[in-house]
């Protein structure tokens, strides 16, 4: 019997070091940007890349990611075309082969429209490593997410500052490899972590998560620069940067310039 290949996210987390995760919306800011940007992020040292699944009504996202999603849709991104981009990235078609773990993050509506089981099988076939679906709570999605796990996909759940200790422990037990902590209760990109009282509150919250979580956890929302990354590394196992990356590449006139800006920004975080 052929031994099942280890999930790339699982393997990455076994390296036992602090992680830097990139969030990128495909085909932003211009069509054709995805593969060059993925290559630039990989070369720049991204440990895991979260690819956004664009949706027309992303209620949990701030204006930067909402705008990026609308541009992605305008540039023809669908669930099917996104999976094809992942397949090309893994095969090295149009770029150097992308080996960094890839996590898809998006709302449930496009996945339901695609067909839940079909999506899971096609995602695995394309080379996706994991899923984070913010509007699909574990209480309402046990069967779907169990099927995802059975196919070897990492399933990531959210923890927020208002999550009680007993639920932190439960979410931690459900997450395959790690949980995703929202730094504050806000839409993406709108959080401000520089205020001393806010920073102290976030610190206490992450210390509480550390007390109740047995698995690793990363933190996102409002992380914009190297100083914030280093601060979060002291409290969590990884930091996620998304809105600031999208802001840095916004307005690039072509895929090459988008990739150059992405690489420049990401190297500055490292």
UniProtKB/Swiss-Prot annotation:
Q: Does the keyword Thylakoid apply?
A: no
Name any one Pfam family assigned in the record. Trp_syntA
Sorted keywords for this record are: Amino-acid biosynthesis, Aromatic amino acid biosynthesis, Lyase, Tryptophan biosynthesis
Which Gene3D superfamilies does the entry link to? Answer: Aldolase class I
Q: Which residues, if any, are the signal sequence?
A: none
Q: Which InterPro entries match?
A: Aldolase_TIM, RibuloseP-bd_barrel, Trp_synthase_alpha_AS, Trp_synthase_suA
Give the Gene Ontology MF terms in alphabetical order: tryptophan synthase activity
Q: In which pathway does it act?
A: Amino-acid biosynthesis; L-tryptophan biosynthesis; L-tryptophan from chorismate: step 5/5
Reactions catalysed, as given in the entry: (1S,2R)-1-C-(indol-3-yl)glycerol 3-phosphate + L-serine = D-glyceraldehyde 3-phosphate + L-tryptophan + H2O
> Which EC numbers characterise this protein's activity in its record?
4.2.1.20
Q: Which CDD domains does the record associate with it? A: Tryptophan_synthase_alpha
Per the record, what is one GO cellular component? cytosol
Active-site residues (renumbered): 50, 61
Known partners and oligomeric status: Tetramer of two alpha and two beta chains.
Q: To which protein family does this belong?
A: Belongs to the TrpA family.
Matching PANTHER family: TRYPTOPHAN SYNTHASE ALPHA CHAIN, CHLOROPLASTIC (PTHR43406:SF1), TRYPTOPHAN SYNTHASE, ALPHA CHAIN (PTHR43406)
Q: Matching NCBIfam families, A to Z? A: trpA (TIGR00262)
This molecule's function is given as: The alpha subunit is responsible for the aldol cleavage of indoleglycerol phosphate to indole and glyceraldehyde 3-phosphate.
User: What is the recorded name of this protein?
Assistant: Tryptophan synthase alpha chain
Show the taxonomic lineage.
Bacteria, Pseudomonadati, Chlorobiota, Chlorobiia, Chlorobiales
- The gene that this protein is the product of is trpA
